[in-house]
Structures are given as C-alpha cells and as structure tokens.
C-alpha cells in the first residue's frame, strides 16, 4: 500500500525524498520486501531540526530509522526537567536526551553508550548544538556497577536501552530490562528523578 500513499504524502507534507527500510524480521513475517515495495532515494546523512535542536541522522547505520521521532516531545520535556540538575543518559544513542538536557540548562550531563558509532554520532550532534556533554563508550551494565561502587549519584537519570526482547517468550531480554533499571535506580540522588523507556 505504501506505493499508493507516497504521492499523497508528498503532496500533504511537501516531502522531497523517500527512505524506506522495513525491519528484517517484520519483512520476513509479513512476506514483504525490506524496501516496502518502494524505491528509496540514496540518502545516508540528513540534518534535521526538532524543537530548535539540530541533529544529523545516519539512515544507513542507525538503528531502525536512525532517529526515534516518537520521542520528540519526551526529549523536550526531559530538557525542561534537566534545568540545574546533574544528568545521566544511559544508552544515549544519537544523544537526543543528553542534548536536550544540556540545552535545557543542566549543570552537567553524562552520556553512556556501548555502540562506538552511536557515541560518535552523539558527539557530532552535541557539537552541532554547542552542547557540553561528557560521553563515555562503555557497556551500561558494567559501567553502572562501577558507578555504584564509587558512590556516584545523579539528580536526573534516564535509561533508554535498545531492544532487548526479541520474542514473546524472551525471558533473558526481560531480565536485562529489570537489571538495567535496578542498577540505574541506585544512581538516583535523594529527591532525584528517574525516567525509563523501552
């Protein structure tokens, strides 16, 4: 159906390019091509603006679409919550929550991610916005345990991990979410705030 809708989308939203990437597992289950039956433009890097924040999105290397637009209002709200606080962003990906916190007036922002490419992209996005953020390339679970041992605390902590659950019966994935949240909660300062996403 997407090929039928594209002309209408172009007309309504004055779009210029099309990039379609169907999740490999979904394409297999639905028996559809990974392109959704649409010839995509050969687009890799695109700069966007969201609530005044600039991002560079990598469609070829990013997770899913390269950017999670459904979190845009949450990123803005997070920035408002960050004013005057020390902020920790776990599994920071492209830096959306970190950058919003820094631009929202956070005292200090620390961002952690396991994926080197994500950390590099987050750094580029922070530079686009002149946002001061301490980035760390590390496994969140190991890093959290070290911070707990060191007695570190943050006023505002967010955990927005990648997909851990790969099926209805994936108990390992459920355990990972539980473990991440249990560890992260130990780093929240008294009267601090904790945000978790999945």
Task: State the predicted function of each range.
Residues 69-85:
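Conserved alpha-helix/loop element of class I SAM-dependent methyltransferases that forms part
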Residues 94-107:
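Conserved SAM-binding loop of SAM-dependent methyltransferases across substrates and taxa
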Residues 117-158:
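S-adenosyl-L-methionine
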Residues 188-194:
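Short glycine-dipeptide loop
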Residues 84-93:
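Conserved class I S-adenosyl-L-methionine
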Residues 2-68, 76:
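Non-catalytic substrate-recognition/targeting regions of SAM-dependent transferases
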Residues 118, 154-183, 189:
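Mobile active-site "lid"/loop adjacent to the S-adenosyl-L-methionine
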Residues 108-113:
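Conserved SAM-binding motif I beta-strand of class I
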């Amino acid at each position: 159906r997407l090929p039928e809708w594209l002309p209408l989308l172009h007309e309504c939203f004055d779009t210029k390019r099309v990039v379609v990437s169907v999740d490999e597992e979904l394409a297999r289950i639905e028996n559809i091509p990974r392109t959704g039956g649409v010839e995509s433009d050969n687009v890799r890097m695109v700069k966007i603006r969201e609530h005044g924040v600039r991002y560079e999105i990598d469609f070829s290397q990013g997770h899913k679409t390269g950017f999670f637009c459904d979190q845009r209002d949450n990123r803005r709200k997070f920035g408002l919550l960050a004013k005057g606080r020390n902020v920790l962003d776990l599994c920071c990906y492209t830096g959306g929550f970190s950058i919003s916190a820094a631009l929202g007036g956070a005292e200090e922002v620390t961002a952690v991610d396991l994926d080197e490419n994500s950390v590099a992209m987050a750094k580029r996005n922070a530079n686009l916005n002149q946002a001061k953020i301490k980035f760390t390339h590390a496994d969140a679970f190991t890093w959290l345990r070290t911070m707990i041992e060191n007695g570190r605390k943050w006023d505002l902590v967010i955990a927005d991990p990648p997909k851990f659950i790969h099926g209805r019966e994936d108990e390992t994935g459920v355990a990972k979410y539980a473990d991440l949240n249990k560890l992260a909660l130990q780093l929240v300062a008294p009267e601090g705030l904790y945000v978790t996403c999945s």
